[in-house]
Amino acid sequence: SQAYLYQLTKDHYPEVFKEIKQRIAEGRWHAIGSMWVEPDCNIPNGESLVRQVLHGKRFFKNELGVDCDTLWLPDTFGYNWALPQIMKKSGIRYFFTTKLTWNDTNPFRHNTFWWRGIDGSKVLAHIPAVGLEGSITPKDLKKSWDGYHEKQKSPHTIQTFGYGDGGGGPTAEQLETARVLKTMVGLPASTIS
């Protein structure tokens, strides 16, 4: 989700980068992110955040042919109130994070909502009930669905999974488990995407 990591892949592993571009063309890889890196969004000023978006979106468009419309910040600890305005003016319509699920004292009670910025700009935000735990089991799917409070707004939520909390992708075993879970009676309907 970070343009910088794609740049490193292009520079050091050009064959892998070529394969990624092919998967994007096939619709099997969704390049998402919109920023150069996944930054801290509490301390930097607006200009810094604008440049993150400028350089990130430029890379995704020029190198991968993708015009990102989602700001994907699953592991950022806080969010500047100017972000909705910056996103809106940059063609970003959606926001995704998981960090707000970490609060054990004051649980964040919203999953899908319009996030309004300083100037009234708004973007559609989604925060799944389950964060970056990384696993995919019947218990995880049930916890994700049961904790999703906005079913009346949208019948869909996201359950992220992958190898560890550090950006690792799904393992072959996890993908097979997800395929099997799709067929199990009594679990929420699921799709791998």
Residue ranges and their predicted role:
Residues 1-193:
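Catalytic-domain carbohydrate-binding cleft regions of carbohydrate-active enzymes
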